[in-house]
């Protein structure tokens, strides 16, 4: 579940970055033009483009799925409190993975900062989440 949520957040986060960037630098792209352009011209404010993205029915559905995934993952993680001694190390690694996943999904649901800070923070969290998942795989059968 966490991997699915992280993958969806990665896709959404990359789209947010691209919409933001393409609006500022007036870069045409078939994926982002419907958010960054109006009547064949770029919107003047990147906030308008991001508003267009977050108003898009399909994108709203994706964000809603990410939120539902967060809720489900959090529920399951709470069930794992106080693991037996032999699983404490795996639980610690799982918690690290969860914290990276949660930070990344929250960032996508509510992007803040500048394009540069969002991009840097998102890329760092994306890498942290992948690294934490790789460590977690050591404990999976």
Language model: regions and residue ranges:
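Amphipathic, heptad-repeat alpha-helical segments
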Residues: 63-85
């Amino acid at each position: 579940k966490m991997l699915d949520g992280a993958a969806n957040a990665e896709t959404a986060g990359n789209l947010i970055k691209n919409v933001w960037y393409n609006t500022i630098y007036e870069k045409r792209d078939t994926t982002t033009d419907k958010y960054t352009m109006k009547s064949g011209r770029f919107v003047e404010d990147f906030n308008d483009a991001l508003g267009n993205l977050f108003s898009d029915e399909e994108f709203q559905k994706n964000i809603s799925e990410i939120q539902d995934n967060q809720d489900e993952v959090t529920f399951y993680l709470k069930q794992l409190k106080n693991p037996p001694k032999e699983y404490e190390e795996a639980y610690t690694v799982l918690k690290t993975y969860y914290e990276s996943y949660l930070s990344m999904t929250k960032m996508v649901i509510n992007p803040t900062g500048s394009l540069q800070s969002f991009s840097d923070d998102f890329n760092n969290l994306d890498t942290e989440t992948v690294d934490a998942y790789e460590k977690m795989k050591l404990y999976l059968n």
